[in-house]
Structure formats: C-alpha cells, structure tokens
Amino acid sequence: MANSRILNDTAIDGQIEETTAWKDFLSLIKIGIVNSNLITTFTGMWLALHISGLSFLGNLNTVLLTLIGSSLIIAGSCAVNNYYDRDIDHLMERTKVRPTVTGKIQPNQALWSGILLIALGLIMLLMTTVMAAVIGFIGVFTYVVLYTMWTKRRYTINTVVGSVSGAVPPLIGWTAVEGHIGVVAWVLFMILFIWQIPHFLALAIKKTEDYRAANIPMLPVVHGFEVTKRQIIVWVACLLPLPFFLGSLGLPIVILGTLLNVGWLVLGLMGFRMKNIMKWATLMFVYSLNYMTIYFVAMVVFTLF
C-alpha cells in the first residue's frame, strides 16, 4: 500500500478525502469497535482484581497481555469481517469507503492480516489463562463464522447472534485474572449482550435503506419499524433486573444502573408518540452509547474508593 492515496469515489462537502495507509489500516480493523470493547474488557479485569483483593500494579503484566491480546483478536475479527463483506459493503453509504471496497487494501492483505492478528491475540491471552484464550476464541468464532458468514445475510436474528461476540470482552478480562467466570462477570456479559440488541436495532432503523440495498435482513427491513420498536422496548426492559445482581459492587452501581435503564425505557416508550422515527432512533442510539460508557467506567471509578 502507498503511504498516501486519494479516494476518488467519495467526497465530503465537495472535498476529495485523502487517507493514509495507517488510516486505511485503522478503518480495516474498525478501531472504534476495538476501543469501545477495551473499555468493557478492562472493566471485567478491574472488577476481578477488586473482588479478589489483588493489586492492579502487582498484576500489570496480566493487564497488558489481556488488553493487547483482546485488542488484537477484535481487530483481526473486524479485518476478516471487512474481507468477507467487501461484496456488499459497496452497496451501503456508511461502508462503501472501507479500504477493502475502494481497493486500498487488497482482499488477501485484509484476510491474512486478520488471521495473523487473531493468532497473536490468542497467544497473548493464553499467556494469562487458558480460559481467557478459550473465551477469546469463542468470541472470534461467533463473530466471524456464526454472525458474519452464517446469520448476517440470512436471518433477522443476526443481531442477537452478533451480540454474543460483543458481550465476551468482560469475560476475557475477568478470566485473565481469575481463571474462571464469576457471578459478576456473567452479569456484565448479560448487560452487554442485551444492551447491544436495542443499540443495533436503533442503528438498523437509521440505516434501513442501506441494509435493504445490500439485501441484509435486518429486523426493520423485514418486519418494519413498529415491530422493531416493540422489540427494542422488550430488550431494554430485560435490562431492568440486572443491576440488582451487582450489589457486591456497592449501592451506587445498583442505583446508577437502574436510573440508566429506566431512562432508556422511558425514551424507548416515547417512540410510540414521536412522529419522526428517525429522530427517535438517533436519540436511542446516542443514549445507548452513553449508557455503556457511563456504566462501565462508573464501575471502575466507584470501586476505586
């Protein structure tokens, strides 16, 4: 790849976008997804250290191996996803500028880069505990095979399947310290699993025409907005009891989680009254991003004291 290339088919505000090889690589591995998953990985690891009474600095080697290893398997999985989806990504506005579509990164480069990153990441996780590496592999397999290759283009439950892989990072972080999955770790998994479904359904509403153009059977494409809204409400409601299983982390965590859940549910119910469904979907999507960030960062901050 050249150090700097011009993207000829995309312009933003009339300007041709210029990218570098490094930016193309970050786009290939979906750096935003990598960063957001690192938050949840770190939270799972931090809470395992906290509950076990272990020192953070005394386990810095484990912390670094876990964070770097997790980053690599997530990045590698995203690269393989970009490789596999390159035949449909050009049909969607939000994905047609990916380097695997524009030709900035060749298919074989994307595939083998992804495989190499996954292999290196699993090796690093194996240097913490076997369980962390096993869970990491399960996450990779679920995202690459069960989601990307199997369900994404065939079934509306693709969102549910994909949410499994997105919920494993805190389990990786936890087991890298403990070697087994504790109750708190399972609760974190469930929060993330359930959270992703309304999060991505809100995005699917916003990008319905994109998904329709690519023939991807997202729920709003197949069953319409009203069914999707009801599904979003059901999944958000499923989050309500989960903070009460985190009592060992302190009452503030329980209260904050409950407030975030109730706020999201109220906003969700407003969707039945709002006439502009795209505005509502945007509000739901933004709320979901803040929900995840605030809650998982708060779990770390509140357990510092």
Curated annotation (Swiss-Prot):
Keyword tRNA processing attributed: no
The biological process GO terms on file are: heme O biosynthetic process
Q: Which residues form a coiled coil?
A: none
Give the Enzyme Commission number.
2.5.1.141
Keyword DNA repair assigned: no
Query: What Gene Ontology cellular component terms go with this record?
Result: plasma membrane
Q: Which NCBIfam families match?
A: cyoE_ctaB (TIGR01473)
Q: What does this protein do?
A: Converts heme B (protoheme IX) to heme O by substitution of the vinyl group on carbon 2 of heme B porphyrin ring with a hydroxyethyl farnesyl side group.
Assembly behavior = Interacts with CtaA.
Protein's recorded name: Protoheme IX farnesyltransferase 2
Instruction: Write down the species.
Output: Bacillus velezensis (strain DSM 23117 / BGSC 10A6 / LMG 26770 / FZB42) (Bacillus amyloliquefaciens subsp. plantarum)
